[in-house]
Amino acid sequence: MTAIVDIIGREILDSRGNPTVEVDVVLEDGSVGRAAVPSGASTGAHEAVELRDGDKSRYLGKGVLKAVEAVNGELFDALGGMDAEAQVQIDQTMIELDGTPNKSRLGANAILGVSLAVAKAAASSYDLPLYRYVGGTSARTLPVPMMNIINGGAHADNPIDFQEFMIMPAGAASFSEALRCGSEIFHTLKGELKKAGHNTNVGDEGGFAPNLPSADAALDFVVSAIGKAGYKAGEDVMIALDPASTEFFKNGKYVYEAEGRSLGPQEQAKYLADLVARYPIVSIEDGMAEDDIEGWKAITGLIGDKCQLVGDDLFVTNVTRLYDGIKNGYANSILIKVNQIGTLTETLAAVEMAHKAGYTAVMSHRSGETEDSTIADLAVATNCGQIKTGSLARADRTSKYNQLLRIEQELGTQAHFAGKAALKAFR
């Protein structure tokens, strides 16, 4: 009944107008699973490899026909006839077939598309929602959203060096209330920016991209918008940052071009600690560069007991890199991006390792997204308690929020909103 009879790959467009891979997996009973693969802008050096064609005459070299060919050829040949329920075996077969440590031969974008589509097809065969199929009967926790309302860095054409300024409505009573709160703050912020003479165009993830001179200026706007929307910063709504520090770490220094200054690793750690002291910041992602391990140890020592320190480029959803952080005591949280590692099995293993070590896990989108809402289901399936999926604009972002609304409604009285308990600062 759940044997794989067909795998169909195709080239589609992501939210930035770049090609990406979409995969359909068809089972013997007629069930179909479809998955589209996201793509990052600020990518970690240690991520699994996204295979691009490199043909400059087509999509400026960003085509993914080689990855699609791998899906329709080698991967189907290897997986045809296998039971879609055998997720671990299927993922392991693809990893071994690729034969490289970073999935560079067949492409993580090809392998991930198949991996997620297989799980969705199997869930469909059992007439189960994906979160229930993957997470079982214990999957009922709706995550606190990290809503990116001001964009900078690689996600916007403005002077701000930090990549994301986010709000977390952790004080809400339910996911739907948290979403409403975020929406109200988003629209209030738009009015405040417009009133101050800033443009209100949005960046890749739907947040505003004003020409502000510093992180402090952006944070002041965020705190003001929270208050003017009728909420209390630090009580109803918290702030999260993603500096994406690897992007401006040059020759051992954190170079703030817009502010005309450079900081060493110890100075960077102290600067972030100062921001946490002055603003209701409860989470910082990639506050230090991916290979600045001494910097990571410094910031963990300074504020690791009161602030969530999330490793994105640092850990790249990889259990080997995560284990090193756990063993050596740096960071206290991991960002989970399915395309950083390339299979569902490895993604779930990273969440499990984090939770066992007392680290938090944050399910995350990429800046190049599609209408695919798989990560919403995975956030609930893993009970990770937090999701990062952009702003309250652009359908590629709201598709995930809308799926979580559906899940919350479907769970009814069983639904549990993670709230403040999901955050290090309130434990």
Swiss-Prot record:
Gene Ontology cellular component list: cell surface; extracellular region; phosphopyruvate hydratase complex
SMART domains: Enolase_C, Enolase_N
BP term (GO), one: glycolytic process
Binding site for Mg(2+): D242, E285, D312
Subcellular location(s) of the protein: Cytoplasm; Secreted; Cell surface
Keyword terms of this UniProt record: Cytoplasm, Glycolysis, Lyase, Magnesium, Metal-binding, Secreted
Reactions catalysed according to its record: (2R)-2-phosphoglycerate = phosphoenolpyruvate + H2O
Cofactor descriptive note: Binds a second Mg(2+) ion via substrate during catalysis.
Enzyme Commission code: 4.2.1.11
One Pfam family linked to the record: Enolase_C
Pathway noted in the entry: Carbohydrate degradation; glycolysis; pyruvate from D-glyceraldehyde 3-phosphate: step 4/5
Keyword Magnesium: yes
UniProt cofactor(s): Mg(2+)
InterPro entries: Enolase, Enolase-like_C_sf, Enolase-like_N, Enolase_C, Enolase_CS, Enolase_N
Residues annotated as catalytic: E205, K337
Molecular-function GO term, any one: phosphopyruvate hydratase activity
Entry binding sites for (2R)-2-phosphoglycerate: Q163, K337, R366, S367, K388
Role of this protein: Catalyzes the reversible conversion of 2-phosphoglycerate (2-PG) into phosphoenolpyruvate (PEP). It is essential for the degradation of carbohydrates via glycolysis.
PANTHER family, per database record: ENOLASE
Record-stated family: Belongs to the enolase family.
Name assigned to this protein: Enolase
Organism: Rhodopseudomonas palustris (strain HaA2)
